[in-house]
Regions:
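Short, small-residue-biased leader/transition segments that mark boundaries at the very start
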Residues: 1-6
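Ser/Thr/Pro/Gly-biased, low-complexity, turn-/loop-rich segments
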Residues: 7-15, 34-39, 154, 170
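Intrinsic, low-complexity N-terminal interaction/targeting segments
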Residues: 10-26
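Active-site "lid/cap" and pocket-lining segments within catalytic core domains
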Residues: 13, 74-76
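Glycine-rich loop/hinge motif
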Residues: 31-62, 71, 139-145
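Bacterial extracytoplasmic/cell-wall-associated proteins, especially those involved in peptidoglycan
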Residues: 57, 61-62, 76-290
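Extracytoplasmic cell-surface/polysaccharide-interacting catalytic and binding patches
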Residues: 65
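Short, glycine-/polar-rich solvent-exposed loops and beta-turns at beta-strand/coil boundaries
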Residues: 68-74
Length: 290
């Protein structure tokens, strides 16, 4: 596998403490009686729609996640957005876990108490279309990719690497796509299983799914998380040196580190894997992951 990085960036840093247990002082706008009208909600890059839903319930903006998840699954209520319409018209759309996966932008939002699931979703898609600007669309077109394909690539980059390596991982993926190689990205397996395992088994790799990049050639069926603007940018502008030098492989290093090891040849890659694989197996074992 190309490896997976266990991100160590502390959420606290990213969220400025918005995820802390709710108190009226946590940046809420209140009425005269001290009750909040608006709540600040932080949704983290790399989270899935299910994690977004969980957070919205935890923050007391939604009473439960069922309606939110069902709207995100079908996406049909949001076809007025050009980006969503394109997905709804795409092949195998019925097999996407959530049509809107990757289309709800991670950010900190002011959300009215009493906002409906549908209103919240609209706000998040609007932000995605703002982040994926006309310049992004032009660049994607120049590269021969659709917005959906770039969001898919960006979502994989988001899950595979820390920000420092985004453009390098992007270069490896672009090089593999160009060479007609399978992407073989572990994070696409994690999306199917819901388990972040460092050392994948043969049965993991054989999972029958259009998201499984060990099985499908090219990109997975759709995005696997909500990518940050940085990951989108990396998908559009891969590291030029790594593209030119045709890097085709990367793997995780020590499980405690976000550092990746990049290789040009399979031989170099296999040498790196031989060094680090025992550490990954140990890491999974200590966490009771089979």
């Amino acid at each position: 596998g190309l490896g997976d990085v266990y991100k160590r960036q502390s959420l606290e840093k990213y969220t400025n403490g918005f995820l802390n247990s709710y108190t009226p002082s946590s940046g809420d706008v209140t009425r005269g009686d001290g009750n909040p009208i608006v709540r600040n909600i932080t949704l983290i890059p790399g989270w899935t729609i299910e994690q977004f839903a969980e957070q919205l319930v935890k923050d007391g903006v939604l009473t439960d996640s069922a309606e939110f998840l069902s709207l995100c699954k079908s996406g049909t209520s949001f076809s007025e957005f050009y980006s969503v319409q394109d997905v709804l018209n795409s092949r195998n759309v019925s097999q996407r876990r959530y049509v809107l996966e990757g289309y709800l932008a991670p950010d900190t939002y002011e959300i009215y108490i009493g906002a409906t699931a549908s209103e919240i979703i609209r706000k998040l898609i609007t932000q995605t279309e703002r982040v994926f600007s006309v310049a992004c669309e032009d660049r994607a077109e120049e590269m021969g990719y659709t917005m959906d394909e770039i969001l898919t690539l960006a979502s994989m980059i988001e899950k595979e690497a820390s920000k420092a390596d985004f453009t390098k991982v992007s270069a490896v993926f672009h090089n593999r796509l160009k060479a007609g190689m399978k992407l073989q990205s572990d994070v696409t397996i994690h999306y199917i299983t819901g388990v972040r395992k460092m050392s994948l088994t043969g049965s993991d790799l054989a999972l029958d799914s259009l998201y499984n990049t060990y099985q499908v050639t090219g990109l997975p069926l759709g995005p696997i998380c909500a990518p940050s603007a940085d990951a989108i940018n990396a998908a559009l502008y891969p590291d030029e040196t790594f593209v030119a030098e045709n890097y085709l492989y990367f793997c995780a290093t020590s499980p405690e580190s976000t550092e990746l090891h990049f290789s040009r040849t399979l031989q170099e890659h296999e040498q790196a894997v031989a060094i680090y694989a025992p550490l990954w197996q140990q890491y999974d074992k200590e966490r009771g992951i089979e």
